[in-house]
Amino acid sequence: VPARVLNYLSDFSAFRPTFCEIANSSTDGLTLDGNSFLPQLHGETGNPREFVYCWYNRDMEPGKTQVTARNQRYKLYKGGKFYDVPNDLQEKQPLVTDSLTPKQVAIKEELQDVLNHYEQFDRLSQVIDGRQ
């Protein structure tokens, strides 16, 4: 595979299906959240992610968990902060809800749906924060 930079979203969940595809190992019967990125490595379109979900708590301290969903351009934090990442790499200026374009409103709603979907699996935050 030639060296190249790919502008596709990917995360850790993509490694298992990619390695299974490389090894010609079936993923039938497995519940996988990620998509193989092997086609993209070969210059094909593949099935890239439309969003990435991230859960982060570096020190496992109560109240310090950061949860985000993002697409190629925008990132939404649980709690509502919404950023135009290429235009605000350090995330210093969250977009103001009243100033969003209709397209940005739709994207924010899509990313909120992602956060809502994955919240049902977020048992670790509940334990860390003492909610369980």
Feature map (PLM): residue ranges:
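Charge-dense polyanion-binding interfaces
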Residues: 101-125
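C-terminal cap/loop subdomain of S1 sulfatases and analogous C-terminal strand-loop tails that border
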Residues: 1-4, 8-87, 118-125
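Acidic/polar, compositionally biased interaction segments
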Residues: 128
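Cytochrome P450 catalytic domain signature, combining two hallmark sequence patches
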Residues: 47-48, 99-103
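Second-shell loop/turn segments in exported
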Residues: 3-5, 97-100
